[in-house]
């Protein structure tokens, strides 16, 4: 959970990370987050906090950014619907997450091939919608006659209307896990490799399975540092 609005629009972050050996989005080497997940030193109290926090995020429909309207953009349908998540071009999490431009095309083509009877919806990144950056999939999605979703929308409004999610390294994939959706990862985000996602790549260091509550406790409660946006005091 970063902030109310987008960082590119000047909204200050309400969460920060201090990592002494790497960074969470760099799968090429260990990070403090990865070590926390592997160690699994989670007491029952911490896991209970994680479970309650996940329930609160679901109830209040909170996301990494929290400025977008929470309203249905996609119509209801009896047809299966698959969400494919684009990212901003040059996002460090892409290159450090074992992905390239070709990975995004592979993801889109796999979504189409694996879900032949489904509607494929390609979600464009908020920074691209804001005109601040470029993405990877816009032209490819149009060429393949996919539905392109460029509305600025709360991710939970999308989760309500899709059956499956495809990502490269986007954090939206982890939020989809919180929403109890199946997630396919074509890169190596921090939440891949722990038995919770359908992984198209592997990381030898991540050789253990973890629960959603364990992963959440490590990433959101132990790894991140938060500041109250009103008092500016550490939470």
Segments predicted by a language model, with ranges:
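Catalytic-core helical/loop segments in enzymes performing group transfer/polymerization on anionic/lipid-linked
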Residues: 1-235
């Amino acid at each position: 959970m970063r902030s109310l609005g987008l960082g590119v629009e000047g909204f200050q972050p309400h969460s920060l990370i201090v990592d002494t050996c790497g960074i969470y989005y760099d799968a090429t080497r260990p990070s403090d987050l990865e070590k926390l997940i592997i160690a699994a030193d989670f007491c029952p109290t911490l896991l209970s906090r994680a479970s309650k926090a996940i329930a609160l995020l679901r109830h209040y429909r909170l996301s990494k950014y929290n400025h977008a309207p929470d309203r249905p953009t996609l119509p209801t349908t009896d047809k299966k619907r698959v969400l494919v998540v684009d990212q901003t071009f040059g996002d460090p999490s892409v290159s450090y997450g074992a992905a390239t431009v070709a990975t995004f095309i592979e993801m889109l083509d796999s979504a189409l091939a694996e879900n032949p009877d489904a509607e494929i919806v390609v979600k464009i990144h908020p920074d691209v919608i804001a005109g601040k950056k470029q993405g990877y999939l816009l032209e490819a999605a149009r060429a393949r006659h996919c539905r392109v979703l460029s509305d600025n929308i709360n991710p939970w409004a999308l989760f309500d209307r899709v059956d499956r999610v495809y990502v490269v390294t986007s954090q939206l994939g982890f939020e989809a896990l919180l929403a109890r959706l199946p997630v396919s990862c074509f890169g190596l985000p921090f939440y891949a490799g722990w038995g919770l996602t359908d992984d198209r790549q592997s990381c030898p260091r991540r050789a253990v399975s973890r629960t959603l509550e364990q992963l959440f406790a490590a990433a959101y409660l132990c790894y991140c540092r938060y500041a109250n946006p009103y008092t500016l005091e550490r939470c």
